[in-house]
Amino acid sequence: MKTHIGTFLSIGSPAVTELAAECGFDWVLIDLEHGCESEAALPNQLRALRGSQTLAIVRVSAPHPDLVSRVLDWGADGIMVPHVNTVAEAQHCVDAAYYPPKGHRGVSRTVRAYGYGMRLPAGEMPKPIILAQIETADAVASADQIAAVEGIDALFIGPADLSYDLKARNSPLPYDDCVNAIAKAARDHSKGCGILVRHADDKEKLKALGFTWLAMDSDLSLVREGFKRNLEVARSWC
């Protein structure tokens, strides 16, 4: 299974989105859950990726059918859904993203995804990519069943939320054991597994566990660290 190297985009800038594609990322996560801009900024970010080989995955705030439909109609290659805790919630993601008979997404052939009617699919409608975020102890317990849902392409760990949830519940489960369990569930069902990578030193461990969707930090974090580093250099001159 191919390893996809990506990054999270929270700033909402088409220029930054375009730059990420120019740099060669396999995918970008355009964030509507924690991002700085509203849904209205999304179409121009997707336009910035046109002509590139970079996949556009949009994190929706929740799998509301109208929101998921608009995101995919605008041309996103797939969605990431936060806080998928149960099989029913995973199936709800598939229902919102897929056309009948697999789901209940409404059909319009004049949307941007199909060139406003100029690039209609010749055969079967394209399949959206669906990344289900595993971010709680409950989700870890259901990871095997979630991975078994047809239409879910990968389990994606939210490290911050998962760590917080385990601490808030005083869970006896060690974080690393949860990561291992999620990765195993994905492997057992031939699904991808992903995570937001905070430390480059984790590379070998994640590779050994079979992670295939890796997000290398975010645009805001990279800008922040660049600002801090340059300011530190400038102040050393004074």
Residue ranges and their predicted role:
Residues 28-29, 57, 80, 156, ...:
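Conserved beta-strand positions in the central sheet of alpha/beta enzyme cores
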Residues 78-92, 155-166, 211-230:
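Glycine-rich phosphate-binding active-site loops on the catalytic face of alpha/beta enzymes
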Residues 1-64, 95, 130, 148-152:
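Conserved N-terminal beta1-alpha1 strand-loop-helix module at the mouth
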Residues 64, 105-116, 134-141, 173-238:
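C-terminal alpha-helical cap/extension of soluble enzyme domains
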Residues 66, 76-150, 159-163:
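Conserved anion-binding
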Residues 23-27, 73-78, 97-99, 149-154, ...:
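Glycine-enriched alpha-helix->loop->beta-strand junction motifs that scaffold or abut catalytic
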Residues 39-73, 95-102, 123-125, 172-194, ...:
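Alpha-helix-loop-beta-strand connector modules within alpha/beta enzyme cores
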Residues 7, 20, 31, 71, ...:
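Conserved, mostly hydrophobic/aromatic
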